[in-house]
Amino acid sequence: MESQQLSQNSPNLHGSAYASVTSKEVPSNQDPLAVSASNLPEFDRDSTKVNSQQETTPGTSAVPENHHHVSPQPASVPPPQNGQYQQHGMMTPNKAMASNWAHYQQPSMMTCSHYQTSPAYYQPDPHYPLPQYIPPLSTSSPDPIDLKNQHSEIPQAKTKVGNNVLPPHTLTSEENFSTWVKFYIRFLKNSNLGDIIPNDQGEIKRQMTYEEHAYIYNTFQAFAPFHLLPTWVKQILEINYADILTVLCKSVSKMQTNNQELKDWIALANLEYDGSTSADTFEITVSTIIQRLKENNINVSDRLACQLILKGLSGDFKYLRNQYRTKTNMKLSQLFAEIQLIYDENKIMNLNKPSQYKQHSEYKNVSRTSPNTTNTKVTTRNYQRTNSSKPRAAKAHNIATSSKFSRVNNDHINESTVSSQYLSDDNELSLRPATERI
């Protein structure tokens, strides 16, 4: 009876995987399910009775035929060799494009949970085939790498890698992220990954491989706990938890903004104005710097701006320092207006200076030449020169000679007036005065 009942319930027993489990060796030419219940041990009979009372699982057709029956208990899966990443070979950019894995996207074969934090640095497994761009962090010498096995299409980095690369420090607060990311970027460059890091314009030299992507992701999450990241970084990682390069690209852009802020502060503190440029240009320059700082949430008060401007004034604008020294309520617009007023006054004075000098020079030229003088070289045949055309030294000599001659010979000339007239009448000669000698 018992064997007949077992044969009638054989389909159900075959469908239940646990009903046929034994620890004995079964001949390969005999189906273990065909063994009669009388040959089974007592504990097997009890398990048969318990399992026969359970609900039937899928039919016989759902169980594959297996001549060597194996226990269907779930096998324990061994842990991955590389921590939370699966072991993969080196993926070239061509293979990445062929597998529809685009740059900056989350790869489908990267099996890691959503941004898990790790207190320690990620140590690669020695059995994992790491590429040569990842230097060892231990003091032991790295294993030699066979360059012949490297794929020819993999672009090699040009930077030199040292034996040891110091890892970045762990992020301690959200406010220190901008400082921490500088050390992290330097760490990647020292790891020979500088050609896949975005530059100031957001450009990269080459596409990263899967192993490089996994390495960057793992090191980033190891040293930057998620709860200490800024809000804008969390928003990027919530959309794509592995998009670390976008975070680095925006971080570089923010660093450029911070550098511009520093440059603006330096330019504002070193303002100088002496009137060599127009007052409008100076006002536009200062207003642009202040507006740029305001866009970066840095407000510059009018009092501070006026003090920095007054410190750099020189020349005719320097007296404004004393005027504003006692003022408590300084207005930047009022200071610009006074600078403009002084600049306009100086401009008018500079325009009038050339015309005054021109009139003065013309007056000098007119006073030196008499308008009644004529060119005696052309009109007179005896080539007599006028007193105005003679040099000053000749004039002085002639005047001195004539005065002396007149004093000595004045009486003699008066006495010989009759004789001179007689000669003049006879010979038609005229005596020239001594002053007319050449």
UniProtKB/Swiss-Prot annotation:
Organism of provenance: Saccharomyces cerevisiae (strain ATCC 204508 / S288c) (Baker's yeast)
- Keywords in alphabetical order, please: Cytoplasm, RNA-binding, Transposable element
Protein's name in the database: Transposon Ty2-DR1 Gag polyprotein
Biased region (Polar residues) positions are: 1-39, 49-60
* Cell compartment(s), UniProt: Cytoplasm
Q: Which residue ranges have biased composition labelled Low complexity?
A: 369-382
Q: Region RNA-binding: which residues?
A: 295-397
Task: Please list the GO terms describing molecular function.
Answer: RNA binding
